[in-house]
């Protein structure tokens, strides 16, 4: 913006200055008030990520390569979380879905999403894209295509024409949006605090590529969107920490030794094959275990 280290969010207006080491624009900006706060039809924080700034998706047209991938009858890439590849298991993960949630779990599970255990946050089992702040009338397939158009599960299930239609509709909305118009409720928001008590899921890092140039006379809405998603490539320490966290997540929480291979229904938590038979209650959430399903994590 100019003076000192002040910054301006293109959707929520002026933000606090005096940045400290470790401060992140996403944490400073996307607090509880901003979740699902529409600005001229654009939900700025619908696509969510962990507090470490992992990239989850971007609103952009499909590339020719992605179109070719989606046209095939088979999936050339494996799912990010194969343990939730079954629609039945995804639906079972909604056992603690908030009663106030506006979208039925059946629609979300059919669209590839499973519940993370946090509020109304869901993730796609294939592209690992995350969405939250659902409102009455939201269509999971449409939101999937809006935020994560290159998901191959989406392309195989709904087809390229559907994804193109959704992208074109929302591109028109972006084209009529003035990026410098400040909303009335542009007051600074407090940094968000993640909920605890539910095991973190593996988070693949994704590097976003800039695809469209700035429009003459100002910053285009597409440029503004990319400004929130771009992340520097992870360093060696980040990769090492991620691998260590992934190893811990795949270790049985009962014996703390063997790898998990059994998923409990309906809660969706994982334990090893040796510990599973003797458990009637999930050791993580204490929910009754109705059935057990063997799963293979790649």
Curated annotation (Swiss-Prot):
Keywords tagged on the record: Apoptosis, Cytoplasm, Golgi apparatus, Metal-binding, Nucleus, Protease inhibitor, Thiol protease inhibitor, Transferase, Ubl conjugation, Ubl conjugation pathway, Zinc, Zinc-finger
Annotated residues for binding of Zn(2+): 124, 127, 144, 151
Maturation and modification: Autoubiquitinated and undergoes proteasome-mediated degradation.
EC class name: transferase
Biased composition (Low complexity): 186-196
Domain of life (superkingdom): Eukaryota
Biological processes annotated in GO: apoptotic process; lens development in camera-type eye; negative regulation of apoptotic process; negative regulation of tumor necrosis factor-mediated signaling pathway; positive regulation of JNK cascade; positive regulation of protein ubiquitination; protein ubiquitination; regulation of apoptotic process
InterPro entries per record: BIR_rpt, IAP, Znf_RING, Znf_RING/FYVE/PHD, Znf_RING_CS
Family under the similarity heading: Belongs to the IAP family.
Protein name: Baculoviral IAP repeat-containing protein 7
Record organism: Homo sapiens
